[in-house]
Amino acid sequence: MFHKIKYLLIIMTLFSTVVTANYDKLAYDFNFNDLDGSNLSLSEYKNKVIIVVNVASQCGFTSQYEDMQKVWETYQDKGLIMLGVPSNDFGNQEPGNSKEIKNFCEAKFGITFPMTEKVPVKGENAHPF
């Protein structure tokens, strides 16, 4: 019985994702603001590989910034774009504002890859990406 409920929940989750997803747009059609408040259009990265990672300064996986920076440094000249997208939607693990996030990332991990301002990634106000 438990397995049937589990599978039903998985199917419902997948269905709700399919219903709300916007398949009329490509990744290049979306815009964010960067941590300085400037427009960051993904169309600038056309014909490049874009790795988009949801990040948070107080997450248990915050150390991933170090690996993300290494990947960025290694492959940016080969057409790879690393894009960090901070969100506070998962356990309030990104409480800082853009300036605090930028200072944290640069001071602690030497981040030089593009980062967006903090955006909601779930719920009614989720960023459309």
Specify the residue positions occupied by each region the protein language model found:
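Bacterial N-terminal signal peptides that target proteins for export
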Residues: 1-8
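Bacterial N-terminal signal peptides
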Residues: 8-17
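N-terminal "domain-start" segment that seeds a small globular fold
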Residues: 20-43, 128
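Short, internal strand/loop/helix patches
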Residues: 26, 31, 99-129
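Alpha-helical scaffolding within the catalytic cores
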Residues: 36-38, 65-70, 99
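Conserved helix-turn-beta segment immediately C-terminal to the redox Cys motif
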Residues: 48-50, 58, 62-88, 106-109
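Solvent-exposed loop/turn segments at secondary-structure junctions
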Residues: 57-59, 88-92, 120-123
